[in-house]
From Swiss-Prot:
This is Arylsulfatase H. Keywords: Calcium, Hydrolase, Membrane, Metal-binding, Transmembrane, Transmembrane helix. It is an enzyme of class 3 (hydrolase). Pfam families: Sulfatase, Sulfatase_C. It comes from Canis lupus familiaris (Dog). Its cofactor is Ca(2+).
Length: 562
């Protein structure tokens, strides 16, 4: 493609939106006319899959086109499955190449508005090694972390109570170690280097600070609004943030309307605490969650309206999705604050069940893609990376494995079969499930090797623990639970050798593919290690004098669109 023929690209990603929350995917209680318009004017994918069932690893895969385990963005722990502190030292490694960096190299102006949650700094609070501007974005306005219930002072804190308990126990144990080591040192029983004693003392201090900070500093230290490298609000004023993000997104389109541009709008909707403007409260039939969905849909409408007004619609590819499925366990009393995953079992945090990983996937490009088309083939969020590389007119990196596939032949109708024969579904670093789409037919087999134990039994979610674990208290299956999701998408009828003649051959084929996949994995630094996820005072972004951080540099006058 020539520079003049390459389209503008607008990527719209919701946070924790269930696939069953949209009218175009079967919901009849929440009104989403603008997202439905995208679907009616474009192509709708019905088997679109996230590479992880929680946000940080899913977004890492989206940005890089690679399974999170390849970049170290998959966790071996049940509680630390995402980045816990903005002042931690983990993040999307600098040697990973995002689609923004590719398109920037191809001559696109690139912008990210909204949630990042891929880390910020490595060694000092101002090095910003993981910052969006160091990952290919020319402009960033939003949250370098993500939205938490802690960001709204009136809400119940989101940091899990069991995480706090573990932090406290770790603090106590690590505090005892240097004290116990001092005894043999001064008794001269054996030599204990001061370096060892001080290392344990430092670790004890870091665990103590992380535990202490979880009881009141989370909002001030995690809920920060930035423009490029500058802190704009600390803590952010939650009632204003959606207004400011929309204004910035529309301004970016206006600024670079001569193109080509890439705009990634990473909504805070519909993550708790479901911050919603007064004009949308009570707007839906589904409570505050539905109100938040409808506010997001309205924001999508404003972006589409701007593209129309600037006469960019026909020359702009618009894509809408969610980072993972809706969360089932989030409640306030008897009120459900999470989304609907429709007919699919499970939800956010569950590595293999469809409800945690099946997400909306809508593409609109009026002059190229057929309006109203529906594709039932397996596709992945990782496919956006090679698709954008193709559209932008460039080449994929040749020095690494790219797990995504270019979707344009499928979207344009040049092929009818997905290029994915196998897809692997991880929960943290643990492979829970694998999917096989036979090349010669429409059948999609899915084998579960690990599934969560729901609590209470039969509840369909892990209400007792808040999120389903990836290891430990889980159910292991040998032989695996096998489903034909092309005929049984709700995964209610497990197959076995008695009711499926192909059972043994299918399982053998999938297990051979898993072995081949694992041969392609190479060891990388673990970004969710205990040390990386600990809060570190020297990495904490601060507007003002640490630890008394605070500022608001935004104008008081907001867009009249609100």
């Amino acid at each position: 493609m020539t520079r003049n023929s390459r389209p503008n690209i607008v990527l719209l990603m919701a946070d924790d939106l269930g696939v069953g929350d949209l009218c175009c995917y079967g919901n009849n209680t929440v009104s989403t006319p603008n997202i439905d318009r995208l679907a009616s004017e474009g192509v709708r994918l019905t088997q679109h899959l996230a590479a992880a069932s929680v946000c940080t690893p899913s977004r890492a895969a989206f940005l890089t086109g690679r399974y999170p385990i390849r970049s170290g963005m998959a966790s071996p722990y049940n509680l630390n499955r995402g980045l816990t502190w903005l002042g931690g030292s983990g993040g999307l490694p600098t040697n990973e190449t995002t689609f923004a960096k590719l398109l920037q190299h191809y001559g696109y102006r690139t912008g990210l508005i909204g949630k990042w949650h891929q880390g910020l700094s490595c060694a000092s609070r101002n090095d910003h090694c993981y910052h969006p501007l160091n990952h290919g974005f020319d402009y960033f306005y939003g949250l370098p972390f993500g939205l938490l219930s802690d960001c709204q002072a009136s809400r119940t804190p989101e940091l899990h109570r069991w995480l706090r308990i573990k932090l406290w126990i770790s603090t106590a144990v690590l505090s005892l170690v240097p004290l116990l080591l001092l005894i043999p040192k001064y008794a001269r029983w054996f030599v204990v280097p001061w370096k060892v004693i001080l290392t344990f003392a430092l670790l004890a201090f870091l665990f103590f600070i992380s535990w202490y900070s979880s009881y009141g500093f989370t909002r001030r230290w995690n809920c920060i609004l930035m423009r490029n490298h500058e802190i704009i609000q600390q803590p952010m004023r939650e009632e204003r943030v959606a207004s400011l993000m929309l204004k910035e997104a529309l301004a970016f389109i206006d600024r670079y309307k001569r193109g080509p541009f890439l705009l990634f709008v990473s909504f805070l909707h519909v993550h708790t605490p479901l911050i919603t403007k007064d004009k949308f409260v009570g707007h839906s039939k589904y409570g505050l969650y539905g109100d938040n969905v409808e506010e997001m849909d309205w924001m999508v409408g404003k972006i589409l309206e701007t593209l129309d007004q600037e006469r960019l619609t026909n020359h702009t590819l618009v894509y809408f999705t969610s980072d993972n499925g809706g969360r089932l366990e989030v409640q306030e009393g008897e009120v459900q604050l999470g989304g609907s995953n429709g007919i699919y079992k499970g939800g956010q945090g569950m590595g293999g069940w469809e409800g945690g990983i099946r997400v909306p996937g809508i593409f609109r490009w009026p002059t190229v893609l057929q309006a109203g088309k529906v594709i039932n083939e397996p596709t992945s969020l990782m496919d956006i990376y090679p698709t954008l590389s193709y559209i932008g007119g460039g080449m994929l990196p040749q020095d690494r494995v790219i797990d995504g596939r270019n979707l344009m032949p499928l979207l344009e109708g040049r092929v009818s079969h997905s290029d994915h024969e196998f897809l692997f579904h991880y929960c943290g670093v643990y492979l829970h499930t694998a999917r096989w789409h036979q090349k010669d037919c429409a059948t999609v087999w899915k084998a579960h090797y690990v599934t969560p134990k729901f609590s209470p039994d039969g509840a369909g979610a892990c209400y007792g623990s808040g999120i389903c674990p990836c290891s430990g208290d889980v159910t292991y299956h040998d032989p695996p639970l096998l489903f034909d999701v092309s005929r049984d998408p709700s995964e209610t009828r497990p197959l076995n050798p008695d009711n499926e003649a192909l059972f043994d051959s299918v399982v053998k084929k999938i297990e051979a593919a898993i072995k081949e996949h694992r041969r392609t994995l190479t060891p990388v630094p673990q970004q969710f290690s205990v040390f990386n996820t600990l809060w570190k005072p020297w990495l904490q972004p601060c507007c003002g004098t640490f630890p008394f951080c605070g500022c608001d540099k935004e104008d008081d006058i907001l867009s009249t669109a609100w």
